[in-house]
Amino acid sequence: MTDSPVLALAKELISRQSVTPADAGCQDLMIERLKALGFEIESMVFEDTTNFWARRGTQSPLFVFAGHTDVVPAGPLSQWHTPPFEPTVIDGFLHGRGAADMKGSLACMIVAVERFIAEHPDHQGSIGFLITSDEEGPFINGTVRVVETLMARNELIDMCIVGEPSSTLAVGDVVKNGRRGSITGDLKVKGTQGHVAYPHLANNPVHKALPALAELAATQWDEGNAYFPPTSFQIPNLQAGTGASNVIPGEFDVQFNFRFSTELTDEEIKRRVHSVLDAHGLDYGVKWTLSGQPFLTDTGELLAAVVAAVEEVNHQAPALLTTGGTSDGRFIAQMGAQVVELGPVNATIHKVNECVRIADLEKLTDMYQKTLNHLLG
């Protein structure tokens, strides 16, 4: 039996070993299809990262599909039922690295746009694609650089669907209409090294810092709101000492992370953290890394169109959630764009034997096409 257009393209993409930041020819496949539809293509290569920006039309509104061609490493090959870069169909599921995150989504986007343009060759507004090979990596030279380039020339995205695997049990059961912000602090507390038998001749930075860390961990940073849970504070890494049991350390390194809602700003978080550390009299320094601001699309044409499209396919409205980690949507939202995430079920992403239900790819294609119908048809 001949593969459907979306399954055939998904297989082609999965077969290319595009472990981040490699693209391995995935974008060329997409570009070839988009050129045939009349898209203007602009390649944007920054260091080791391959990106492209494609646009069809010059009018507003500008609707964009955003995604990434890179995938995480396959992990232990012995644990895969099938080779991770040899797309294989088993019992109605397409197996392979990137099947759900997010080469399946990319195939759905392309086929949906092909079908939409066939029905609406003179559609309203403009359609764009923003594709990167640097989403699974350090996200330095990917979407953020493309967004900076577009903003510098005042080419602003109005509405964007990011194809991240948002769904939990069935495709379209969850639409992500926002994400929390993320900021990390690398704290170094200074003390005086010494012998554990002579603590009066030393100053243990661990002992000094623990009460402050306990206070930070116990703090209610905010109460969240209708769209976001309360801001969370977590300590993922601690490091002190030489490894010897008889040496008081001279320094104590602590890494902590906030996932924060729209109730807080990164500057407010910094101010409150420094206030606690200062109150405990610590000799310290903090290096802050802001990974992304929170964003929220709580109303607007895009959200209404996506919800309607999902309802038409599933006969049930999706849940609107802001849970999970960060995504490239945070960079696009900086333009003032309406941004939502809609993609496959995320149960197997980043795992061995990653897979996606083939029927879900067909449904997702329909959801994308119906969204275009509502917005630009």
UniProtKB/Swiss-Prot annotation:
EC number(s) per entry: 3.5.1.18
Residue positions of the active site: 70, 135 (proton acceptor)
Keyword DNA damage: no
An example molecular function term from Gene Ontology annotations: zinc ion binding
Cofactor note: Binds 2 Zn(2+) or Co(2+) ions per subunit.
Keyword Nucleotide-binding (UniProt): no
Residues annotated to bind Zn(2+) 1: 68, 101, 164
Keywords: Amino-acid biosynthesis, Cobalt, Diaminopimelate biosynthesis, Hydrolase, Lysine biosynthesis, Metal-binding, Zinc
InterPro entries noted in UniProt: ArgE/DapE_CS, Bact_exopeptidase_dim_dom, DapE_proteobac, Peptidase_M20, Peptidase_M20_dimer, Peptidase_M20A
Disulfide bonds: none
One Pfam family linked to the record: M20_dimer
Residues where Zn(2+) 2 binds: 101, 136, 350
GO biological process, any: lysine biosynthetic process via diaminopimelate
Enzyme class: hydrolase
TM regions (residue ranges): none
Pathways involved: Amino-acid biosynthesis; L-lysine biosynthesis via DAP pathway; LL-2,6-diaminopimelate from (S)-tetrahydrodipicolinate (succinylase route): step 3/3
Cofactor(s) required, per the database record: Zn(2+); Co(2+)
HAMAP family: DapE (MF_01690)
Family statement: Belongs to the peptidase M20A family. DapE subfamily.
Annotated function: Catalyzes the hydrolysis of N-succinyl-L,L-diaminopimelic acid (SDAP), forming succinate and LL-2,6-diaminopimelate (DAP), an intermediate involved in the bacterial biosynthesis of lysine and meso-diaminopimelic acid, an essential component of bacterial cell walls.
Subunit structure: Homodimer.
Name of the protein: Succinyl-diaminopimelate desuccinylase
Organism: Vibrio cholerae serotype O1 (strain ATCC 39541 / Classical Ogawa 395 / O395)
Name of the encoding gene: dapE
